Amino acid sequence: MSNSMVNEAEPKELRDESDFEAIFSGGDFTSVCGFGSLLSERSARSTFPELINFRVARLNGFRRVFGNVAPIFFERGIAKPETKEISSLCAEPCEGETIIVTVFEIKKSEIPAFIQREIEFRFLAVLPETLDGKLYDKPAVLCSRSTDEEFFQVRCKGNKDIFLQHYGRHNIDKIWRDDILPCRVYLRHCILAAKNLGETAYNNFLDHTFLGDRSTTIREYLASSGSGIMEEEPPESLKFRYGG
């Protein structure tokens, strides 16, 4: 069986800490896949100061999509609801697609905080491969697309108060949408991070990352209605955090 066939097999969903423990039972560390801001080692280290073994890898059977509303952009003052430029990034299964990612290890003790920080996502255990095609022998966690229904039932336990705690103060009633656009500061950051990883990662990000319509690539978006994004500087207080 080829590496790509192994890699595109149905990934295992990790619903809670016990699922993480079952998959990552050996050793004190858990592998994480970065595909957006975590393409930046600086960003990754700001979130996981004690991470180890930061490296570039390939993940078959997935694409990137700007299709989820992120409260953090509202909190940091960089969301633009009037133009719908409020989206963060997810990875979603897509046969025949490939994305360049980063992989690194975090301490298992960091998993509960990781789950809370990325609470809107579906966590999948995936098998990346090296850039020369050698399949990893251990899985990594990927933050994948979820649904509003799954978030409400699984993460919020069907409790509207929990949903409102996460999203209500920003008047967000739907997380997963196909009619929103990338947060400009965040998109610029991700592109710079990919560029810092080299030409292969840069071109992969431009051509295998899509708007919510799942047909417009980021390369096409930057050449049309998204033009000018790369020339815009982040607010002074966020220049380090969103500087690529």
Regions found by a protein language model. Give the residues of each.
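Glycine-aromatic micro-motifs
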Residues: 2-244
